[in-house]
Amino acid sequence: MTARRVLNPVQRVAIFGGTHGNELSGVFLVNHWLKHGEEIARPGIEVRPFITNPGAVEKCVRYVDTDLNRVFDSENLRNENNLNLSYEVKRAQYINSIFGPKGSEDAYDVILDLHNTTSHMGATLILEDSKDDFTIQMFNYIKTSMAPLACSVLLIEHPRLKYATTRSIAKHPIGVEVGPQPQGVLRADVLDKMRRIIKHALDFINYFNDGKEFLPCILEVFKVLDNVAYPRNANGDCTAIIHNNLQDQDWKELKPGDPMFLTLDGRMIAYEGDCIVYPTFINEAAYYEKNQAFTTTQKMTLCAQAIRCTEPK
Amino acid sequence: MTARRVLNPVQRVAIFGGTHGNELSGVFLVNHWLKHGEEIARPGIEVRPFITNPGAVEKCVRYVDTDLNRVFDSENLRNENNLNLSYEVKRAQYINSIFGPKGSEDAYDVILDLHNTTSHMGATLILEDSKDDFTIQMFNYIKTSMAPLACSVLLIEHPRLKYATTRSIAKHPIGVEVGPQPQGVLRADVLDKMRRIIKHALDFINYFNDGKEFLPCILEVFKVLDNVAYPRNANGDCTAIIHNNLQDQDWKELKPGDPMFLTLDGRMIAYEGDCIVYPTFINEAAYYEKNQAFTTTQKMTLCAQAIRCTEPK
């Protein structure tokens, strides 16, 4: 008999929109659900829609002072120097007081944080912990339910790159990233994909709480390797843009020698790595200021144990 | 023998980038040409690349205080109340002092103003005056040179909608609008189209100055009819988004009864006009704040007389 993890039922779920104020699918859906909650209601579970960065939503910008999705580290969450805190750090502390505290037993069980990207990533789920069997099982369920539509999983576990995301205060933090969609735009096709992901996530939780056992599963994920910077000259000016052959090719293999950038005088700059990688977040608008042209990933397969709830209702 | 217009040679041409600071193709090209002018040089013509809204470019936003591309009316250009002027109105006066004055003999002959849109408009040329034979001839030349790639012409002459564009200070104002491209993003395909339009425009001017006669021509244009607003509830909240069937269908016919919007509860809102129209600027990010979901146009054909230069070099 295989190992089986017996887990507590899920009691509290939050759905975050507007962590980046110009990523409109989540803002629009969360505002809708705040008025019409029946779509996300599931028996015996508190499901709470919440706008995390109302200041940024109001201005339709990514953030007011700093990226809310990078400040949920212990230093910021504990900082009591109230006079000098940025809008987003104050907001992070407030969010942590409601849905956390991060790392504690009181934290929400699940946070689904809704994002858009200008990259052609399609429907994407973001996993923070490769040992989180519950979330891997959920992602497997969502992927299966979304088929034949592709639904990719990005694993952001990394020895050096730390994200300190808004959702990271939950026991099971889940990023939902759907693109391509320009900042400040609502596309019906993107909205529909995001909405279906949330439906399947909540259905999974409902089945789990009801006592359904989820058998051991495997999940193909793309694990973050590194960020690739734009070429710049001595003045710091960007000297090349994403090559046509790479544009819109998120999740497709990039081989050493493949075109990566194009300079304005027509010179191609090739990828010079020593192995095949799978780029993602290619040409994401918000990452120009971080000087990230794209993120490389490697494909790997995670295995999750069977899971079951302790106390079927 | 047909009529022929004999016109003065073109002496001064400006290429504007960054009128909207987050429309990056023009910003990137103009900054490139400021350092490497040989690509846009033509004998006997001053061709001046210029960043019109450096404050907005610096912040990668559409504008700092107000839309620079709507303030070139006589009231703003003459306003001397320096203390209370917005950044963009001050900038408009400065631009007018260099490239204008608007409506005077001293104004630049041609201004090519470079824009991007999140709409699927492809390569688009914007015409302000249906009687401007020189510009119609240029657009005909550009369209022919771009083929088989589509290059649409939008005519913004309208009894009620007035634009007061940045380029309107020139004798021949030319808008260049290429999409789809998200705000804050540079796409190689979009950059290439814009660059080819500028090459063909400058080649046309060069041929014209050299004494080449351009024979009478006809030009298919899409003339602005009206702007269509998003449906809103009593609180002013947007209640529907662009329908999937209309999204990305710029320049395609929209018939009475065709789907136009979709509400979050799945209801379709149909187009209820009384004739076929050709929508454009569908789901443009910058027009949410103007509450414009798209612009309707009608197809028409303009005729231009033959043109020739007075003094062939």
Curated annotation (Swiss-Prot), chains A, B:
InterPro entries cross-referenced by the UniProt entry: AspA/AstE_fam, Aspartoacylase, AstE_AspA_cat, Aste_AspA_hybrid_dom
Disulfide bonds: none
Gene responsible for this protein: aspa
Molecular function in Gene Ontology: aspartoacylase activity; hydrolase activity, acting on ester bonds; metal ion binding
Species: Xenopus tropicalis
This protein's UniProt keywords: Cytoplasm, Hydrolase, Metal-binding, Nucleus, Zinc
Family affiliation: Belongs to the AspA/AstE family. Aspartoacylase subfamily.
Locations listed in the record: Cytoplasm; Nucleus
Top-level lineage group: Eukaryota
PANTHER family for the chain: ASPARTOACYLASE (PTHR15162:SF9)
Positions of Zn(2+) binding: H20, E23, H115
Listed name of the protein: Aspartoacylase
